[in-house]
């Protein structure tokens, strides 16, 4: 199989929550195979800086923008800017998300709703905004960053697990809706990676070791280990892959 199938020259990828963590890592990976980029987060300065750095490193076109994924008007503004400056969105990586760690009894309804709004409704908003342009082109990739915790439970994560499980079924549903339009829709389920969101666990030796003990490979994921999966799902190489989930968790959910 030719490695040209993994190249993305002439395509534009939008990564939500792309200014840091796995989002920034995936943005670099996609730029590394030729994709132009749209980086969005809630902070314009972080998004602009990330886009500038990646554009200079990989010699691609990119812009950064502030967008709250829970606000359709802000999401639609990003899509409109991408249409003007980069020819529209070809690849959407729904990565923005948060986690609030509290038990069901301790969880205020406002915290529950905030996680659901950002992790589940936000990606729906982005896909709804980006899909019409993909339909016009007859080609597109929508990728949801779910989690291994969308497949298995973990105490003190009720809205996070619910939202990430929702993304898996949202991907399956939209895969059926958009198949006739040349658009594939899939989900990635990462296990523990050393991201900003996981700092509380990284800084707690007992909690960290508890997680490691459940991973057959025996360690947390290294950031670059997400690269191959995102490139595959974003590229022509995955043209017959839709409505499915790829888990990157060191074997946690195999048990």
Task: Spell out what each predicted region is.
Residues 86, 139, 219-248, 253:
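C-terminal substrate-recognition "lid" of short-chain dehydrogenase/reductases
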Residues 127, 163, 171:
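Active-site helix of classical SDR
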């Amino acid at each position: 199989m030719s490695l040209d199938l993994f190249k993305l020259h002439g395509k534009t990828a939008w990564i939500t929550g792309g200014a840091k963590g796995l989002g920034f890592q995936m943005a670099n990976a996609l730029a590394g195979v030729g994709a132009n980029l749209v980086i969005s987060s809630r902070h314009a300065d972080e998004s602009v800086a990330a886009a500038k750095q990646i554009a200079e490193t990989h010699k691609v076109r990119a812009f950064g923008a502030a967008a709250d994924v829970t606000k359709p008007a802000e999401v639609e503004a990003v899509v409109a800017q991408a249409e003007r400056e980069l020819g529209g969105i070809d690849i959407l990586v729904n990565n923005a998300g948060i986690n609030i760690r509290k038990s069901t009894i301790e969880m205020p309804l406002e915290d529950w709703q905030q996680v659901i709004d950002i992790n589940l409704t936000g990606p729906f908003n982005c896909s709804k905004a980006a899909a019409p342009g993909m339909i016009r082109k007859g080609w597109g990739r929508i990728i949801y960053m779910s989690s291994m915790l969308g497949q298995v439970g973990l105490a003190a994560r009720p809205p996070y697990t619910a939202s990430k499980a929702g993304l898996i079924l949202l991907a399956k549903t939209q895969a059926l809706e958009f198949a006739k339009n040349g658009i594939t829709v899939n989900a990635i389920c990462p296990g523990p990676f050393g991201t900003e969101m996981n700092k509380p666990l990284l800084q707690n030796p007992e909690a960290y070791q508890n997680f490691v003990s459940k991973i057959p490979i025996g360690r947390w994921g290294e950031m670059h280990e997400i690269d191959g999966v995102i490139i595959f799902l974003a590229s022509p190489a995955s043209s017959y892959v839709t409505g499915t989930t790829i888990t990157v968790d060191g074997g946690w959910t195999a048990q």
